[in-house]
Every structure is written in structure tokens, then in C-alpha cells.
Amino acid sequence: MIEADRLIAPISNHFKDEEVIDRAIRPKKLADYQGQDHVRDQMEIFIQAAQMRQEALDHLLIFGPPGLGKTTLANIVANEMGVNIRTTSGPVLEKAGDLAALLTNLEENDVLFIDEIHRLSPMVEEVLYPAMEDYQLDIMIGEGPAARSIKIDLPPFTLIGATTRAGSLTSPLRDRFGIVQRLEYYKVADLQHIVQRSAQCLGLSMDSEGALEVARRARGTPRIANRLLRRVRDYAEVKGDGHICAQTADRALNMLDVDHQGFDYMDRKLLLAIMEKFSGGPVGIDNLAAAIGEEKDTIEDVLEPFLIQQGYLQRTPRGRIATDRAYLHFGIEK
């Protein structure tokens, strides 16, 4: 099994065909945005205040693990403000001219959403600073002694940046965001509501117990919950009568090798490698990546956050350590 095939991976090329469905079931308004109560309450006030002043919303940085709804929240902000949203990502903006082209096409109070903003090149960042602060674009024309700088006025706009690695942002960029929101892993009750809403949007027959079973195994992540829901739907249609109850969901998820903690093959492989190959740790990230045949970034950004948050794994200065809870989960004696 490779990373692209992981059913519970928050990001997967294998499921790009279902991105259209993902967009269809995303909430469009704050009132429909389930969970993240502190974020929703704050953003409701900030948006209303900006509308009362007839101003652009202050620049917004959203960070947190993958799949928690950063893109969804950015689109909700644009919808609530009643403005257009332009979407791009850090790696796509290779040259200053790429960013300049986007900025000069914005209308007043529009939203520019940059995903993976921590991957912006230093050259592009330099162009972004005056645009965020003064709504001006500084562009160099020509080269050498004949080079000159021209300033282009921009309409007021809102930059929304999303990242899984807030610590990788440079201080000058991070300090220019007036609003910073961290998304946390979702509670099971909130995920249950999300699954029920998605089932309704997809026209599925599902009871609350079935939704709860899916929510329990979704690793606190809405994107994973919706993906599991679609696979459970397939199972229910082929092996049952189409209705999703707790028993059907349990059988489907067991077949998919997703256990009651939301662990899949790669989670178990990582924890077992630490316990069996490295005597429980500590083990460095390079050795761990080599042992399980996975990229370091995938381990740090996709696998580890949930395992650490749930208390199965610890990061220490000396390396990764499997906790007592991990040994208990697998029934292995230390």
C-alpha cells in the first residue's frame, strides 16, 4: 500500500475524481460551519464589523493539520462578505509577476486565497509585503543601471493564507496578518453532524448511529469523514439495502482496514516499527522514514499529528517514542 492509496490520508491524488463531490457538500455559510466554535464566533464578529465599515476584511492566516477545512473557511469568508475569491497556492507562484497578475485583477474587497503559503519564494514574499500593508505593488522595470521601480495602486483586498506549518512562515509575513486562526481536530459529536449533513447532501439513507460509527474513525478530520462516508455508501449499496446503520458502517470500515481508533495500515506500520524495530524509541525521523519507506514530510504532516494528539506517540529532542498507550493498543508488552 502506498500513500496515494491511503483511504484516511487527508490529501490523496487517488481521490481527485471526488473533489467535485467534496466541493458540493462543503458548507457555504458560517451558520452551516460545524465545529471550531471559537473560530466561527470570532469570524462572525470580524466579518460583520468589516461590512458595517464597508471595508475589506483584515488579512487572515488559517493554520492547522490537513483536512480540517482551511479552504472551506476561506470560501465561507468570501461568501459572507459577498465578494469574489481568487485561489492559488504557494508553489504555483514562482515569479513576482505571477503574483502581480493576480493582484492587479482583484476587485475592491475581493479575497485572494493562497494555500500552502509557507512555500512562497522569498522573491514573491517581497512583492506581497507592500501589497498587504499599503495596497501597493512595487515592480522593477528593466535591468541594470536602467532599472526603475514603479508603484501600482491596488484596490483594498483580503489575503487569506492557509498552511499546515505556521512555524515555517517568515516573521515579516506572519506579522502582516491581522487575524490568525488555528483549526483544531474535531470532536466526534461535531463530526457526526458533518457526516449526517453530507449524507443528506448526497441523498443517502443513514441513521445517527451509522454517522457516529463513521465519525469515530475519522481521526477528527472532516475530509476523512466524508471520504469514509462515500466508501461506506459503496459497501451499503453492494452488500446491503443501501441504508447505513452502525453495523453496516462497522463492517465496511473493518473491510477497509480502518480500526476503531481511525488507524489504517500506515499508522500501524509506523507505531509497530518504533516498538519492534527500535525498542519503542527514541528514533530519529530519518531512520523512521527509511524503516517504513515513507517521506519525512508525510510522516510529520500527515501521520504524526493525530498520533501525538491522541497520545500514542511523543516527539522528543532525541527522536520519536511510542507511548504506553500505543503498547496497550497493540497488546504488546514493553
Swiss-Prot record:
Gene Ontology molecular function: ATP binding; ATP hydrolysis activity; four-way junction DNA binding; four-way junction helicase activity
Major site of localization recorded for this protein: cytoplasm
Record's subcellular location: Cytoplasm
Entry-linked PANTHER family: HOLLIDAY JUNCTION BRANCH MIGRATION COMPLEX SUBUNIT RUVB, PTHR42848
Protein name as catalogued: Holliday junction branch migration complex subunit RuvB
Binding-site positions, Mg(2+): T71
Top-rank taxon: Bacteria
Lineage start: Bacteria, Pseudomonadati, Pseudomonadota, Gammaproteobacteria, Vibrionales
Coiled-coil annotated residue ranges, if any: none
Function according to Swiss-Prot or TrEMBL: The RuvA-RuvB-RuvC complex processes Holliday junction (HJ) DNA during genetic recombination and DNA repair, while the RuvA-RuvB complex plays an important role in the rescue of blocked DNA replication forks via replication fork reversal (RFR). RuvA specifically binds to HJ cruciform DNA, conferring on it an open structure. The RuvB hexamer acts as an ATP-dependent pump, pulling dsDNA into and through the RuvAB complex. RuvB forms 2 homohexamers on either side of HJ DNA bound by 1 or 2 RuvA tetramers; 4 subunits per hexamer contact DNA at a time.
InterPro entries, sorted: AAA+_ATPase, AAA_lid_4, DNA_helicase_Holl-junc_RuvB, P-loop_NTPase, RuvB-like_N, RuvB_C, WH-like_DNA-bd_sf, WH_DNA-bd_sf
Subunit structure: Homohexamer. Forms an RuvA(8)-RuvB(12)-Holliday junction (HJ) complex. HJ DNA is sandwiched between 2 RuvA tetramers; dsDNA enters through RuvA and exits via RuvB. An RuvB hexamer assembles on each DNA strand where it exits the tetramer. Each RuvB hexamer is contacted by two RuvA subunits (via domain III) on 2 adjacent RuvB subunits; this complex drives branch migration. In the full resolvosome a probable DNA-RuvA(4)-RuvB(12)-RuvC(2) complex forms which resolves the HJ.
